[in-house]
Curated annotation (Swiss-Prot):
Protein name: Pathogenesis-related protein 1
Native organism: Asparagus officinalis (Garden asparagus)
GO annotation terms (biological process): abscisic acid-activated signaling pathway; defense response
Pfam families: Bet_v_1
GO CC entries: cytoplasm; nucleus
Length: 158
């Protein structure tokens, strides 16, 4: 079993607060609307959106080797636009990973947009290839889809 981590940054032309709300806090609702070819649905399994909340995202893409992801919110800072979440079920847990956490931080930039900083930490099970490049691509796609939606809908998530 090997441990690993990676960091990734995505620049977007939407304010940090709007991106944080749409891409993190409400992704289980927004994702299926804006990327239905990837996300079939989402829901809050337990909790109210604060620390300890568990959310489920159902995957609708045969290229992904799992059909859903359940994540627990471990840290939420509405003022600094930060979220840390832990994979608790699905998403390759037990098949690809022993454990995985992801930390997102949305930092305002001088152009009115923001820089999304992501750090993932994980333990890969023996014999499983590290696919961090695919994970980074997925994060970029997630943020760019959210950005496109928010630019097209300027009153959403204000």
């Amino acid at each position: 079993m090997s441990s690993g981590s990676w960091s990734h940054e995505v620049a977007v032309n939407v304010a940090a607060g709007r991106m944080f709300k749409a891409a993190m806090l409400d992704w289980h609702n927004l994702g299926p609307k804006i990327v239905p070819d990837f996300i079939a649905g989402g829901s809050v399994v337990s909790g109210d959106g604060s620390v300890g909340t568990i959310r489920e995202i159902k995957i609708n893409n045969p290229a992904i080797p799992f059909s859903y992801v359940k994540e627990r919110l471990d840290f939420v800072d509405h003022d600094k636009f930060e979220v840390k979440q832990t994979l608790v079920e699905g998403g390759g847990l037990g098949k690809m990973f022993e454990c995985a956490t992801t930390h997102f931080k949305f930092e305002p930039s001088s152009n009115g947009g923001c820089l999304v900083k992501v750090t993932a930490s994980y333990k890969i099970l023996p014999g499983v290839a590290d696919e961090s490049a695919k994970a980074k691509e997925g994060i970029t796609n997630h943020m760019k889809a959210t950005e496109a939606y928010l630019l097209a809908n300027p009153t959403a998530y204000v």
